[in-house]
Amino acid sequence: MKYNKAVMTKLINQHRDLHDELKKIKVEMGLEKNLAIKALFHSAVADNGPYMKEYQDLERLQ
């Protein structure tokens, strides 16, 4: 599965907990938004993460 910023952004906008986690990553790690989104992808979606199925569903709609 490949990282797609547009799909990841949609997923974040649909889930408040992902949005909150994104903010937390930005502050704690001092990352800019794009890198924080990518980090969130690797922690919450990639490698059978809890949001992998929803991400794949959104990706199919693209």
Predicted regions mapped to residue ranges:
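A general structural motif at alpha-helix termini
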Residues: 40-44, 59
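Compact alpha-helical subdomains of small soluble proteins
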Residues: 53-56, 61
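N-terminal acidic leader/helix
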Residues: 1-29, 34-35, 43-54
